[in-house]
Amino acid sequence: MSICKANVKKLIYLSLATFVASSSFAARAALAEKPGISYDEKKRQSNDIAVSVVVSGISCTCARFTEDIRNVVNDLSPDGIRVLPVLGNGGLQNLNDVLFLKNVDMGVVDEDNLRLLKKRDPALYANIEQRVQYITKLYNSEFQVLVRNDIASYDDLRGKKVNFNLKDSQTEVTADTIFNNLGITVQRSNYDNDEALQRLKSGELAAMIILTGAPQVTFSRVKKEDGLHFLPLDQQSLPKHDLHELSANYLPAELTHELYPNLVPEGTTVPTVANRALLVAYTWPENSPRYKRIAKFVDAFFSKINQFDSPSRHPKWREVNLAAEMPGWVRYKAAAEWLAAHRNQAVTTSPDKTLDQSSPELKQAFENFMQKYGSSSGQKPLSPQEREVLFAKFMKFLGESKVEQAAAR
């Protein structure tokens, strides 16, 4: 009986061995008949779907935005699109990187960069708006100045040590413009945000500045007991200063308790100004592979814009309106064509918003009012930038009125 069992076990073993061997042979034969993708083909496919976006430091709102875009848009199939965020230096360098670096397709830059570069070197940047164009406005970058409690206004910073963020960062570029406009001279330092906050708490610094979309992660870590607050920047807080130029070049903005519960008391706001962060791209020839890749990205990004209205995404996505126009900039052709082809499709992250800043009807009504008011009052016509600022204030007024009406119901 034991011999029979041994024979059976041996037969089973031989059968399994034969099956495994035949299966392995069949698999090898199938692979031989249909070889895998070659190294060169895989390399070509990988490059054909990749687009790069240069951003500032990792704590910048632009980095979080680009990460969100990557997470929503990425499709690693051979015919898909892949977004590669690149950490750059920020400031004017991001725009220079898009303009001059051959491996950079797009970048997140601030609206005033175009004007500032043309002012610095009119010859080099003479036609920059034809070489780098905007895809869409992303969010507002608030000018945030955090100070010790013994500092009450910008004038109190004269001669004191103020951190302008890293050298040539967007914060330094804009802070330089604003402090020069105010005629306030300070002792500058260029620490990163985390180090600057520690030096501010210790009393070594009187203030630190960050220009980015609020809430900013470094400021969000500040505690009430740290003895710090934000400085207001408006005509009421600086009555002896002429803020006309600042109002013409920057948007009115405010920091709220909801953004910074430990820094802004409930029921109050801190007025300031803001720049607009734009997604821009290099204008490759329309028949080139790189232009076609950016056009594919635009289609994927714009088509999925509603997916960014999610609690898992940065709250600043609520400000995005793909159709918003930027004075002084030229719209990237692929983006303009997409918007023209999707006029009836929602182009905001929150399509249920009733106050659409780029609504053609609302904007046209505002422009008609300005023309009639200007001709009847005899006042000097406003510049495009001044009209944009006034329109932003008009939209804010409408928004507040809508809230009051809802509360009264």
Regions found by a protein language model. Give the residues of each.
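Extracytoplasmic
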Residues: 46-50, 78-80, 90-93, 101-103, ...
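Pocket-flanking alpha-helical
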Residues: 70-71, 84-126, 197-199, 215-223
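Segments of small-molecule ligand-sensing domains
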Residues: 271-381, 385, 405-409
